[in-house]
Amino acid sequence: MTKIVRSKYKASRRLGVSLWGDSKDAFNTRNYRPGQHGQNTMIKTSDYGLHLKAKQRLKCYYGRVTEKQFRNTFALAQRMQGNTGENFIGLLESRLDTVVYRMNIAPTIFAARQLVSHGHIKLNGKKADIASIRLKEGDIIEIKESIQQIPLIQESIAKQGQTTPKYLSFDVSSLTGKYLRVPALSDVPYPFEAEVHLVIELYSR
């Protein structure tokens, strides 16, 4: 088990949810915080603590996006027309690494980011190696031929149709995906309750 895998499972226990819905997640059998006092249920969380935890869960879920990137995404969502929470999630879901993960090209958000940063993903026919690139409606994602037969990729692609959201499409025969539209919050398949309103309240203070 790699350090990233151990670390992400520990994050699930620390934040009190199975962040990625993984059956191997230690939170499923030890649903309390790690450490000596992890099973102490008498510890009360302040209002600020609840807001902070909601933010930390989302940051971890999207592959530990940096605080600067997260705050800048919120600032952009605030400037856009419409509901800030919906805008915020729409921006996070339009990131290239997130879309690669959602299309089941990679088994985890961390693996998706690695594929992008190593130049294994094409965006509209050109190499794209920046994970935070935001996609637009109609953008096309391709997997480079050099990695198409890697077992990990093949195993992930085999899940097509099971969990691919409706705002994306993926053609298994050509290994090509399409970003169809910006999703609504209700479209996003979070494995836990994403309390986006608490994140918005925290950043709006």
UniProtKB/Swiss-Prot annotation:
GO terms for biological process: ribosomal small subunit biogenesis; translation. The lineage of its organism: Bacteria, Pseudomonadati, Pseudomonadota, Alphaproteobacteria, Rickettsiales. InterPro entries: Ribosomal_uS4, Ribosomal_uS4_bac-type, Ribosomal_uS4_CS, Ribosomal_uS4_N, S4_RNA-bd, S4_RNA-bd_sf. It comes from the Bacteria. Residues 94-157 form the S4 RNA-binding domain. This is Small ribosomal subunit protein uS4. One of its GO terms (molecular function) is structural constituent of ribosome. Pfam families: Ribosomal_S4, S4. One of the primary rRNA binding proteins, it binds directly to 16S rRNA where it nucleates assembly of the body of the 30S subunit. With S5 and S12 plays an important role in translational accuracy. PROSITE patterns: RIBOSOMAL_S4 (PS00632), S4 (PS50889). PANTHER family: 30S 40S RIBOSOMAL PROTEIN, SMALL RIBOSOMAL SUBUNIT PROTEIN US4M. HAMAP family: Ribosomal_uS4_B (MF_01306_B). The keyword Transcription does not apply. Part of the 30S ribosomal subunit. Contacts protein S5. The interaction surface between S4 and S5 is involved in control of translational fidelity.
